[in-house]
């Protein structure tokens, strides 16, 4: 699983791209702290089985934070956040939430899985697969399987838990599963070469695509808005 350092590193890249010239030492501390919050659930593992990747690694937590921010900002001039930190504080708060989700939670969703809707719904989910173009098969994706084989039992906190640094032998996770069968060898007929053009061969790499698009689009939008504001200011002068 990605380490906390990896999560924070990705978050700082996100924040640097989103905040631009507003990215400073305070931003680093706020973003790093927000991104590290999910991994604190490892401390609850000894007293709450399945806490890791559940208590902190879910979409309910950032949802509640967004609701709290929205409720505060609806107060207008009486907004505690805006009154104390101004527009910059509001921007930093929402950036921290984006980093919490984009760098703190989703990377674990695509590497091993998380209890995405805990405690509202106790079930671990993993988004993983491959996307590529094949000269034989055309576009191939395995992220969404519309005709799955016999489903495996749903992972929950009662039958699955991730090994952590608190365990003697940390692993990616443990669960009861049957032995997998190897793929059969090739058949007869003429040989031909299949050429693959990789796009995203793992869930983590697939997540980087929309993430990069989001950061790039946001930075371009903010740059355009700043440029337009400068032009309008010059016209008034």
Per-range role (PLM):
Residues 1-237:
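N-terminal membrane-targeting hydrophobic helices
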